[in-house]
Amino acid sequence: MTSPPMLDIRNLNVALLNGRPILRDVSLTVAPGEVRALVGESGAGKSMIGKAVLGILPRGLKVTSGEILLEGQPLHDLRLAARRRRVAEIAALIPQDPLTALNPVRRIGAQIVDPLVKIHGWTRTAAQARALDLLHRVHIRAPERVMQSYPHELSGGMRQRVLIASAFAASPRLIVADEPTTALDVTVQKQILRLIRELQQETGTAVLFVTHDMGVVAKISQQVSVLFQGKVMEDAPTEAVFDAPDHAYTQALIAATPSYADPARPFSPVPQSLIAEMSAALAMEVRR
């Protein structure tokens, strides 16, 4: 018998309280052990998909229709407390900005250990050992010292490594990585991407990876969903998307990405005429 997808999103619609659509009939799956990228420009709705899965949509947004299933179980069938427990058991988040994600007045060790103890029922001794092990595995030198440090005492790359360690600490089966390299310089970004990929392959964790960078998509994912104004424009294996992109918007995103392998290759921004045409088509859908 075939096992269900780790994550299965079916015709998900999210809107503002005034009815303005944010996500439009989004459907996608993430298989166990798979990395799926969500890519698009700012405002495409990429992060909102991850937040809807985790049940942390911002105030003023609501799911109006559709289903989200984790390991085949519909989350909408569960009461709020049971849903939170289910999500916490299966999924974890790597946020975009480590400086705001980490509590500035608590030591790093406590921020990794306490969730393991309070949410997942670990003993404090086991949780501390797990935290030290993960800090070591994300290539942090002197993890014992870092456990006693505060966030402001670490560099941006070190803080992001801490968040990765924290996300993997409870052995989640799904990780939502919400633009985890956006705030980092290119050199550190490359290290963090390699680190996430290493841990993902080692643990077999499924990853929903949010990014605006097609270069990152090529490096880390097997599947990709291209979004524009909350709608999936193209959904295909990553290799196929780069070899023969089907949608004009996907073609434009690739053309707008600098090539480090071929610096002489020209690139250009996404044409405003294409954006206007796609926006008008989506507006017509809303009117219908």
Protein language model features and the residues they cover:
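Conserved ABC ATPase "signature" region
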Residues: 74, 126-145, 255
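A short, surface-exposed alpha-helical micro-motif characterized by mixed small hydrophobic
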Residues: 217-219
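A short, proline-enriched helix->beta-strand linker immediately N-terminal to the Walker B motif
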Residues: 169-173
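ABC ATPase "signature
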Residues: 232-236
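ABC ATPase NBD coupling module
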Residues: 62, 75-92, 110, 118, ...
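Short catalytic/signature loops enriched in Gly
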Residues: 5, 141-144, 237-288
